[in-house]
Amino acid sequence: MSAPIGVLALQGDFREHRQTLSAIGVESIEVRTLADLTKSAGLIIPGGESTVMQKLAVAYDLFEPLHDAIKAGLPTFGTCAGLIMLADEIIDGIPGQRGFGGLDVSVRRNAFGNQLDSFEVDLKFKGVSGDLVHAAFIRAPIVERVGDEIEVLSTLDDGRIVGVRQGNLMGISFHPEVTGETRIHELFVSMVDA
């Protein structure tokens, strides 16, 4: 890969994503400007607070460029709030809340409750070899509806969807970057390289 992977660095746990990419030998840059975005071979939208992320993207004049780049085919991976930002529909968003879109899914924010209801679990993840993926759910969203073009990558034991892919877009409800899990980032890098 000649160009680095950009990590949206307006808010959230972007540093942890950069550390994970570094651990697998992939160069990354923090995306805060349009110039940063244009240097990126792919984009990671980290966990954080989706409403704040939207406001900051607008304030930094990045909202429309991000929306347009994703729509034009920039490989993009969203975790937790990043999944919310990639969803075409946010079921319980605050008035005026919208994401960049791209994934034909409907998501519900904070579907598992508040910070105190956070949990970790091991789960299967399509496209990842080896053992189960160790996943941390922190005020996580859930995918409640998937469109015809959506590939479900992961579910909880009760069937709730926590990982999806549509073409070169991937979104997950959980945080692999905080558990030391690198295989999902490796999968995303393979999507960027494809």
Where on the chain are the PLM-derived regions?
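N-terminal beta1-alpha1 cap of cysteine-dependent amidohydrolase-like domains
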Residues: 1-59, 63-71, 182-194
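Hydrophobic anchor at the start of a short beta-strand
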Residues: 28-29, 76, 169
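Redox-cofactor binding/interface segments in oxidoreductases and associated redox assembly factors
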Residues: 45, 78, 172
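Cysteine-nucleophile active-site neighborhood
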Residues: 50-124
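Amide-donor transfer/coupling interface in amidating biosynthetic enzymes
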Residues: 109-194
